[in-house]
Amino acid sequence: SVVAGSAAFRKISRLLQKSARSKWDIDVMSSPALQGVIRSLRIYHGPHAPRDAMDQLYRLFVEPGALVFDIGAHVGDRISSFRRLGARVIAVEPQPLLFSALNHIHGRDPLVELLDRAVGSDAGVRELFVNTTNPTVSTLSEEFVNQARGARGWEDQIWDGRVPIEIVTLDGLIARYGTPSFIKID
């Protein structure tokens, strides 16, 4: 697990900045986006992250050796919990910078498979609306973006980037990896 202020945390931050400059459209992967991901890393992998409580909750559903799907993996704190419990994890995250963070944190774990995709009712390709200053609220829903525009609580949120993303279905994931004992979706 990555702890804020640690050498591993600083290394991941540097790698994310390098990835943002070299791999994706700089407008989508701007400095505010990096700050949003770094903030999430601090919250969910930092010294005050609720690891014990999370493990206690998921232990009710996940046994050692279980197959777990993490749909919308964000920065991978649930992946970390599932792995601490001994599960094999298939993690899906469509947001490019969050996926890069996941890859740096969990990419070498042979019991974690990371997919830079989204899950939907139909397979295909869709446009991901990226909020570059708050990348955790990126969405496939243009309707959501339109309704959030100017809505109370969403005044400062702008979806100013777009990325084509492959869509897979739960049925497709099950056909490829098997039936999971637990699916976390958000």
What positions do the PLM features span?
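Phosphate/nucleotide-binding beta-alpha loop and adjacent structural elements of enzyme active sites
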Residues: S1-I185
